Amino acid sequence: MERKRWECPALPQGWEREEVPRRSGLSAGHRDVFYYSPSGKKFRSKPQLARYLGGSMDLSTFDFRTGKMLMSKMNKSRQRVRYDSSNQVKGKPDLNTALPVRQTASIFKQPVTKITNHPSNKVKSDPQKAVDQPRQLFWEKKLSGLNAFDIAEELVKTMDLPKGLQGVGPGCTDETLLSAIASALHTSTMPITGQLSAAVEKNPGVWLNTTQPLCKAFMVTDEDIRKQEELVQQVRKRLEEALMADMLAHVEELARDGEAPLDKACAEDDDEEDEEEEEEEPDPDPEMEHV
């Protein structure tokens, strides 16, 4: 096997580099690189070389395969050192807006008085405040086609929306509108007014108000409130009747289950009372019987 050694100029004087080609196997043609110290010690990897040299030489930019120093890494290292030195002079900016606490030996925290030339300045936005994640336009359309089932695995009939509620946007159906309004009621704290801008019908992608559901602007009248109150009263009445019927059925079931044990207990009590009366009855006087 052919072995050749060359002096490595990137390492201290006396170090040699050797390349050994592989003759067989899947990695035939691949060359293994070894380094030899002036004393003849063999090194097979860069970590071994770094451990042997220690702090006498910086091998962070040394390429073990080629035996050369990489200039690109050397430039980056120099820039990093220059940047660190400049940062030490200028100092790092303090992004914390909280008032500092005086470092004293007292067990109580003593705040530092803040003095400013512009006391009227106020922070318009707080970056630490949680911000709602952005959503896609017409994201409510993802809710279309979803159905609800009751405990008996039967399809729940969807409710009918009032005639005053009309959808807006491309492909907005009644199901999409119902899902959008229900989602807005549960996730938004703002009043639901619909899309107030008339230009939204011409170009919904530009003039759409993302804080409102996909419906046109609507007004709630006194007649709508009265109808809603009537519906609520009807639902409450049906609920009351259902609860009353369930309670009566429960009472009848308890009475039916308790009739047989109750009759048996009453019969046992009567037998005990008869036995006690027979025991308490006095014996007849023999003189009275003779008379």
Curated annotation (Swiss-Prot):
Q: Which residues form a coiled coil?
A: 216-245
Q: Where is the composition biased (Acidic residues)?
A: 268-291
Where is there biased composition of kind Basic and acidic residues?
254-267
Q: Where is this region: Required for interaction with MBD2?
A: 1-80
Q: What InterPro entries has UniProt attached to this entry? A: DNA-bd_dom_sf, MBD2/MBD3_p55-bd, MeCpG-bd_2/3_C_dom, Methyl_CpG_DNA-bd
| UniProt cross-references to Pfam families, sorted A to Z | MBD (PF01429), MBD_C (PF14048), MBDa (PF16564)
Q: Where does the record place the modification Phosphoserine?
A: 56, 85, 144
GO terms of molecular function: DNA binding; methyl-CpG binding
Query: Which GO CC terms are listed, alphabetically?
Result: chromatin; cytoplasm; heterochromatin; nucleoplasm; nucleus; NuRD complex; protein-containing complex
Q: Domain MBD, which positions?
A: 1-72
Reported function: Acts as a component of the histone deacetylase NuRD complex which participates in the remodeling of chromatin. Acts as transcriptional repressor and plays a role in gene silencing. Does not bind to methylated DNA by itself. Binds to a lesser degree DNA containing unmethylated CpG dinucleotides. Recruits histone deacetylases and DNA methyltransferases.
User: What name is this protein filed under?
Assistant: Methyl-CpG-binding domain protein 3
